[in-house]
């Protein structure tokens, strides 16, 4: 009877129902992997593996360019971005392109240019992927010794890690240069309702930047998600970029320490598991960031955060009832607490009613009305500006609630039908991606550790039920 798994590999292999199937001249017998195992068949064919990765990058960039142009074609300047189902243009607007005071979109040409540039670069990547997959050398180091690598070569792997870190550091500095020198970025906190500005006074104090990492993730502390001014965000990118670049140089110049050589598994599947674990952490962090943070993700483009929409509702009705003669400082609600205003656990004046749970919200349209002890009653009576009323009424009716199938918004709000917040989409998608990547991390880590320990050789095929079944035709 044939051996249906490769004795050369210590890795679990699924059985093909039809063992005669051969794809691209590589069948399960010769490679140890079934046709659907994709890049696993290319583990030792560095040229073809390069082609697969370059082609994959081309697909990603093609999607970005095509989706970008699709959003430009459908964009209407008379409605806010978050009402139009856009997920890419808000990112470009946040970078300061095409935006005027108050977050108004005044020019869509930069968005068109972005889409075209991505399409052109995707064509270059696509050509490179096809070339390396079909025409280039199967094993690239036979032609270019510089690119020789073996998965178990710890020194070469850390050199590759170093190169990746340097590229990530350069990416972080691209945002820094955009904010400092190339037109600035959109600041939702700019006076009068937000504007594009250059960042001139970076926060570089390590106690502030790394203080975010040491904060509690709970309540008003909010870990790194609590960052609420662009000086801190851009300064943080200076730190991250510098650490990545210097760390990359260090990894290129050094060899792994003995403890690292012992503690880590050095195989292709292990590196895959480490990468998936890191991406999982990124996904969960991005989920929290886009859901709660209205500085890095301005509400003008992404819609209000949940707490922001709730506080906006309380503010809108306070404005209305105050105009009708209500004394908002004294009126009691059905609970005996203040109907419009009450005190937080720390004694600050906050909005009353159900929105009290969001008392530590900070938002650009609300902060001018605060004094040293929370909301200032005098300012609420005399200083509310029309733009604050308009914005809160808009945010009240566009809460990031509901399902992802275009019946979101506040259930009782007739104007919110067929509205789904990009915040809901981005937070949900990144949570799901973070979860699945974490499962993938556990799966591949378990396989890699088992292979390293030498006991993972797949299922005993002699008694596998499928062998007694009729082959699929």
UniProtKB/Swiss-Prot annotation:
GO cellular component terms, semicolon-separated: photosystem II; plastid membrane; thylakoid membrane
InterPro entries noted in UniProt: PS_antenna-like, PS_II_antenna-like_sf, PSII_PsbC, PSII_PsbC_sf
Subcellular location: Plastid membrane
Residues annotated as binding [CaMn4O5] cluster: 367
Transmembrane annotation, as ranges: 69-93, 134-155, 178-200, 255-275, 291-312, 447-471
Biological processes per GO annotation: photosynthetic electron transport in photosystem II
One Pfam family per UniProt: PSII
Membrane topology label: Multi-pass membrane protein
Residue(s) carrying N-acetylthreonine: 15
Phosphothreonine: residues carrying this PTM: 15
Propeptide: 1-14
Cofactor note: Binds multiple chlorophylls and provides some of the ligands for the Ca-4Mn-5O cluster of the oxygen-evolving complex. It may also provide a ligand for a Cl- that is required for oxygen evolution. PSII binds additional chlorophylls, carotenoids and specific lipids.
Alphabetized UniProt keyword annotations: Acetylation, Chlorophyll, Chromophore, Manganese, Membrane, Metal-binding, Phosphoprotein, Photosynthesis, Photosystem II, Plastid, Transmembrane, Transmembrane helix
UniProt main location, coarse: plastid
Highest rank taxon of the organism: Eukaryota
Gene Ontology MF terms: chlorophyll binding; electron transporter, transferring electrons within the cyclic electron transport pathway of photosynthesis activity; metal ion binding
Subunit annotation: PSII is composed of 1 copy each of membrane proteins PsbA, PsbB, PsbC, PsbD, PsbE, PsbF, PsbH, PsbI, PsbJ, PsbK, PsbL, PsbM, PsbT, PsbX, PsbY, PsbZ, Psb30/Ycf12, at least 3 peripheral proteins of the oxygen-evolving complex and a large number of cofactors. It forms dimeric complexes.
NCBIfam families with a match to the protein in the record: psbC (TIGR01153)
Biological role: One of the components of the core complex of photosystem II (PSII). It binds chlorophyll and helps catalyze the primary light-induced photochemical processes of PSII. PSII is a light-driven water:plastoquinone oxidoreductase, using light energy to abstract electrons from H(2)O, generating O(2) and a proton gradient subsequently used for ATP formation.
Family the entry assigns: Belongs to the PsbB/PsbC family. PsbC subfamily.
Name of the featured protein: Photosystem II CP43 reaction center protein
Species of provenance: Cuscuta gronovii (Common dodder)
Name of the encoding gene: psbC
């Amino acid at each position: 009877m044939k051996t249906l798994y490769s004795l050369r590999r210590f890795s679990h292999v699924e059985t093909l129902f039809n063992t005669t199937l051969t794809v691209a001249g590589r069948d399960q017998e010769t490679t140890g992997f079934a046709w659907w195992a994709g890049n696993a068949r290319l583990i030792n064919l560095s040229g073809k593996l390069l082609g697969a990765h370059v082609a994959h990058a081309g697909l990603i960039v093609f999607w970005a360019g095509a989706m970008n142009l699709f959003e430009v074609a459908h964009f209407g300047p008379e409605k806010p971005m978050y009402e139009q189902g856009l997920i890419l243009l808000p990112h470009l607007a946040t970078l300061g392109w095409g935006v005027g005071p108050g977050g108004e979109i005044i020019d869509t040409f930069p968005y068109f240019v972005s889409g075209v540039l991505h399409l052109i670069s995707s064509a270059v990547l696509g050509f490179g992927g096809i070339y390396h997959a079909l025409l280039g050398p199967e094993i690239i180091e036979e032609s270019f010794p510089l690119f020789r690598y073996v998965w178990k070569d710890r020194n070469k792997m850390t050199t590759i890690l170093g190169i990746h870190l340097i590229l990530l550091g350069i990416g972080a500095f691209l945002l820094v240069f955009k904010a400092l020198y190339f037109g600035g970025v959109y600041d939702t906190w700019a006076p009068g309702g937000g504007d594009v500005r250059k960042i001139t006074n970076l926060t570089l104090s390590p106690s502030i930047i790394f203080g975010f990492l040491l904060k509690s993730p709970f309540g008003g502390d909010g870990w790194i998600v609590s960052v609420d001014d662009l000086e801190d965000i851009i300064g943080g990118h200076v730190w991250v970029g510098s650490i990545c670049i210097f760390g990359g140089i260090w990894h290129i110049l050094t060899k792994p320490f003995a403890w690292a050589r012992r503690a880590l598994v050095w195989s292709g599947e292990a590196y895959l598991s480490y990468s998936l674990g890191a991406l999982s952490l990124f996904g969960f962090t991005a989920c929290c960031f886009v859901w709660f943070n209205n500085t890095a993700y301005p509400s003008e483009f992404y819609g209000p955060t949940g707490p922001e929409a709730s506080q906006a509702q309380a503010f809108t009705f306070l404005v209305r009832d105050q105009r009708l003669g209500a004394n908002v400082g004294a009126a009691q609600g059905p609970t005996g607490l203040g109907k419009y205003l009450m005190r937080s656990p720390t004694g600050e004046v906050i909005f009353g009613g159900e929105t009290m749970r969001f008392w530590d919200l900070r938002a650009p349209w609300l902060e001018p009305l605060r004094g040293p002890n929370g909301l200032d009653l005098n300012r609420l009576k005399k200083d509310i500006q029309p733009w604050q009323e308009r914005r809160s009424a808009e945010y009240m009716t566009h809460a990031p609630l509901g399902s992802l199938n275009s019946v979101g918004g506040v259930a009782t709000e007739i104007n919110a039908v067929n509205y789904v917040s990009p915040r809901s989409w981005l937070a949900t998608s990144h949570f799901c991606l973070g979860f699945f990547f974490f499962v993938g991390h556990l799966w591949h880590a378990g396989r890699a550790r088992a292979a390293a320990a030498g006991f993972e050789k797949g299922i005993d095929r002699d008694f596998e039920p499928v062998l007694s079944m009729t082959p699929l035709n």
